[in-house]
């Protein structure tokens, strides 16, 4: 098993677990909430088949990475990604983020630049800014909304996950057709491996303001979003995002929920590979 050390807490190392497979141009996969690097299974297989080197890591607090008690903010998440890229000495790398993992990309580029990066892909993104404020009146929700999510997780994370995955995969429409009960159960099991601190702190990072980071997207970019996303609605995210980064390649997947990496894996892979190979 492969780990890198990104810090310490109370004299113990904070380690990130990662997998590194294949040869060729490196692609770094950055997972969404509340999953881990293995949630990229359908994309990982397609990328390996296409001749890429595929690196997937577990964000701190999730999967097999250290269940740290702090560091749940995008400056730290970006620093963790930077540490991985530096430790593996990656050049000409492609960063592919999903959901919460898109935030790492935006903040990484603004903090560390694109000297090691060839392309970036934002799938089901958080950007540009979810919080309703005076200068962002059409955001997704006020601070109280995100505070309430975090409180629900702290109160009963297991009950929270039931409702979350219902909307994550749009189960009323997709269970039994685009996602099996077994795949859903696997997602829940993965989420239950997350640290208590991490899973409660993560929702408080979602209203991060990424607008100032977007100018740092100076490499070719893909923005891809599902039109039926009930977690990060497309009108609050993908469509606004592409207006601010008009040079990006923009793809909408009709009828796809937030969890489109699984439910619409073939469509995601087709668009992703077309972008990477273009």
Identify the residue ranges that each predicted region occupies.
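Conserved acidic catalytic loop of the alpha/beta-hydrolase fold
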Residues: 76-93
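Flexible "cap/lid" loop of the alpha/beta hydrolase fold
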Residues: 106-111, 115-155
């Amino acid at each position: 098993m492969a780990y890198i050390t990104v810090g310490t807490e109370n004299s113990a190392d904070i380690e990130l677990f990662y997998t590194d497979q294949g040869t060729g141009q490196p692609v770094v996969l950055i997972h969404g909430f509340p999953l881990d690097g293995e949630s990229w299974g359908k994309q990982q297989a397609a990328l390996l088949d296409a001749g890429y080197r595929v690196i997937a890591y577990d964000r701190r607090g999730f999967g097999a990475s250290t269940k740290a008690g702090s560091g749940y903010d995008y400056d730290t998440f970006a620093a963790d990604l930077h540490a991985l890229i530096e430790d593996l000495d990656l050049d000409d790398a492609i960063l592919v983020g999903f959901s919460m993992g898109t935030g790492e990309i935006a903040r990484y580029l603004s903090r560390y630049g694109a000297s090691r990066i060839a392309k970036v892909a934002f799938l089901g993104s958080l950007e540009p800014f979810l919080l309703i404020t005076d200068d962002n009146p059409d955001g997704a929700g006020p601070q109280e909304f995100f505070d309430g999510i975090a409180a629900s997780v702290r109160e009963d994370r297991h009950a929270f996950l039931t409702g979350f995955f219902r909307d994550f995969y749009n189960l009323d429409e997709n269970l039994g057709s685009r996602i099996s009960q077994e795949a859903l159960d696997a997602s829940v099991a993965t989420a239950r491996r997350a640290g208590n601190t991490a899973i409660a702190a993560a929702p408080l990072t979602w209203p991060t303001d990424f607008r100032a980071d977007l100018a740092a997207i100076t490499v070719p970019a893909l923005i891809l979003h599902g039109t039926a996303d009930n977690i990060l609605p497309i009108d609050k995210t993908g469509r606004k995002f592409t207006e601010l980064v008009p040079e990006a390649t923009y793809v909408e997947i009709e009828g796809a929920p937030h969890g489109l990496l699984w439910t619409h894996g073939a469509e995601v892979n087709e668009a992703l590979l077309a972008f990477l190979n273009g």
